[in-house]
Amino acid sequence: MFTMKKSLLLVFFLGTIALSLCEEERGADDDNGGEITDEEIKRGILTDTLKGAAKNVAGVLLDKLKCKITGGC
């Protein structure tokens, strides 16, 4: 149970970081007139990768939780 709490906390933490990065990028776009640089594109790819990984981890954790609750897998 403790490891599941740690995993969920990690997923929440990564989601919060991704959200704050998006807000910072949105503010930066306003400053430079909306131009998109190569660095911003790379950040977007990294953010999408992190979001996908977080969704996969959350799905696996939910499946394990469902198995524990129902009592059979």
Swiss-Prot record:
Pro-region residues?
23-41
> Which locations, inside or outside the cell, does it occupy?
Secreted
Domain of life where this protein originates: Eukaryota
Q: Which UniProt keywords apply?
A: Amphibian defense peptide, Antimicrobial, Cleavage on pair of basic residues, Disulfide bond, Secreted, Signal
Give disulfide pairs as residue numbers: 67-73
Q: According to the UniProt entry, where is the signal peptide?
A: 1-22
| Role description | Antimicrobial peptide.
Please give the organism: Pelophylax fukienensis (Fukien gold-striped pond frog)
Q: Which family does it belong to?
A: Belongs to the frog skin active peptide (FSAP) family. Brevinin subfamily.
Q: Which InterPro entries match?
A: Antimicrobial_frog_2 (IPR012521), EF_Hand_1_Ca_BS (IPR018247), Frog_antimicrobial_propeptide (IPR004275)
Q: What is this protein called?
A: Pelophylaxin-1
